[in-house]
């Protein structure tokens, strides 16, 4: 019976690890999603800014304004590059968290299987004991009957 308690404790610990891993995976996915949204926003802003530049150029702009546009576009490109790197890092974090969750889930399933096997074995042993008692009772009853 002590082993049954130990298995239950180990299974409970494994369940907590799975919950913690799932929580971490959720946080990593939210971070990745935010990074994707920020990158999309920057790219959209860059496209909008380029369109404004094209419109202004067709109307004619000064060289100073042209230089300002170019510098700002370069700054946006650097920011986009940095956000792409961040997104790659978040994607790696999600992959690591997902693998960790899968590993912990597999471990939990192993503990559950062991606990089920132990319960089945205990039930089988109890049934055998009951059958043995019934057989002994029937044997004694048969011995007491006068023939």
UniProtKB/Swiss-Prot annotation:
GO terms for biological process: bacterial-type flagellum organization; bacterial-type flagellum-dependent cell motility; chemotaxis; protein secretion by the type III secretion system. One of its GO terms (cellular component) is bacterial-type flagellum secretion apparatus. Keywords: Bacterial flagellum biogenesis, Bacterial flagellum protein export, Cell membrane, Chemotaxis, Membrane, Protein transport, Transport. The keyword Cell membrane applies. One of its GO terms (molecular function) is cytoskeletal motor activity. It is a peripheral membrane protein. It comes from the Bacteria. It is found in: Cell membrane. Belongs to the FliJ family. The FliJ protein is a flagellar protein that affects chemotactic events. Mutations in FliJ results in failure to respond to chemotactic stimuli. NCBIfam families: flagell_FliJ (TIGR02473). This is Flagellar FliJ protein. It comes from Escherichia coli (strain K12). The lineage of its organism: Bacteria, Pseudomonadati, Pseudomonadota, Gammaproteobacteria, Enterobacterales. The gene is fliJ.
